[in-house]
Amino acid sequence: MFTSTANVKHVTPIPAGIPALKAISLLQGHEFFIKCDPHMVHYEASPLSDKDPVPSVPAGRDVQPVVGAPPKCFVVTDRVHALPAGLWDSDVVSRYEFVDIARGVFVRIRSPLGVVMESVWEVREKGEGGAAGLELVEDIVITCSRLLIGTVKSTCDSGWQGIHLKMIDHLQNADGRA
């Protein structure tokens, strides 16, 4: 009753000459993926315990996990600005769950206050048979309190270009360093 859902989708063209497999491999590099988060101040691997549900892709997302690629989890600390100009910053600790899919990665982020973001990051072909090139697609479903949905959605909408740019820059760098 007090929970709301929002969908957000961001698409960035992948420059010509970058193979799809290279872009997919980048998305499946979980630690690099985390490092693209502009708010991240710390992260560490978090093994699954017997009481944790095994991360999986929810039904209805039209993607399947890669067989033989076990899910990976991390605990990530983000520094979030609660007031402008850094007058009041807050560290938010979230659990990131990564499930590799054929053309990218599914990421579930579980944050405090019941905020859950489920994202499919894929490399897709543009046009008929990919004739128009490739694109990086970020498709997010946000679920949280109605009171927070606008703030969470705004945060997703405000920083996506920088994240995508960092990924594209990494793909274009011939020696593979960020």
Kindly give the residue locations of the regions a language model identified.
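Short, surface-exposed beta-strand/loop "edge" segments at domain boundaries and coil↔beta transitions
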Residues: V80-V92, V115-S119
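Hydrophobic ligand-binding cavity/cleft-lining segments
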Residues: M1-C73
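Hydrophobic residues positioned within well-ordered beta-strands of beta-sheet architectures
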Residues: V8-H10, V76, S94, S119, ...
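Short beta-strand segments that buttress and anchor functional surface loops
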Residues: V75-A85, F106-P112
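Beta-strand/loop substructures that line and gate deep hydrophobic ligand-binding cavities in soluble
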Residues: E97-S158
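Detector for long, hydrophilic, low-complexity intrinsically disordered regions
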Residues: T3, L147, G176-A178
